[in-house]
């Protein structure tokens, strides 16, 4: 949900908005493009569950960092999570597990799942402009690992990621946002 309740006089803002570096007319929910971060792990998890037959029975190990190509993927806690199941890796939001899953899935499979969940696709909604979320082709394994945790060059609107989260509660069906003026 998004709501606009300005605490200022919108007429005064209109007079100087062209000079404002904060872009007051940008609807950050539908047009702001940001790395989705850990919310993207939903996409990586869905791809792994569909493509890796034994993934739910596996154990993963998080040491806090892993070298991938010329870079290092780190976990947000720094010291690692130790042994994890897939469920606990998702619950703890383990970057190493999801980076490893992205590498195992390969770029084409992860990108395909991202696209089935709306990345690289124009959303056409009545009365609502939503910018296209982007999952570009990773140029290295390092980029792919970070893409699997929603970092690097992956960009999404907050509305798109909310729609993906909502699909979990809606038996996998992504709902269409509605613009309303009152409840």
Language-model features, listed with the residues they occupy:
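Beta-lactam-recognizing serine transpeptidase/beta-lactamase-like catalytic domain environment
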Residues: 1-38, 43-183
């Amino acid at each position: 949900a998004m709501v606009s309740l300005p605490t200022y006089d919108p007429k005064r803002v209109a007079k100087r908005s062209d000079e404002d570096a904060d872009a007051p007319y940008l609807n950050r929910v539908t047009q702001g493009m940001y790395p989705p971060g850990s919310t993207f792990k939903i996409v990586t998890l869905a791809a792994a569950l569909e493509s890796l037959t034994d993934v739910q029975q596996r154990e993963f190990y998080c040491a806090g960092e892993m070298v991938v190509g010329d870079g290092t993927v780190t976990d947000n806690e720094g010291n690692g999570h130790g042994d994890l199941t897939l469920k606990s890796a998702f619950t703890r939001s383990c970057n190493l597990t999801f980076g490893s899953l992205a590498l195992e899935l390969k770029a084409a499979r992860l990108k395909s799942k991202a696209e089935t969940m709306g990345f690289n696709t124009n959303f056409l909604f009545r009365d609502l402009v939503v910018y296209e979320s982007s999952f570009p082709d990773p140029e290295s394994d390092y980029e792919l690992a970070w893409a699997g945790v929603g970092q690097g060059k992956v960009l999404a609107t907050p509305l798109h990621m909310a729609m993906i989260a909502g699909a979990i509660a809606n038996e996998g069906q992504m709902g269409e946002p509605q613009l309303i003026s009152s409840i």
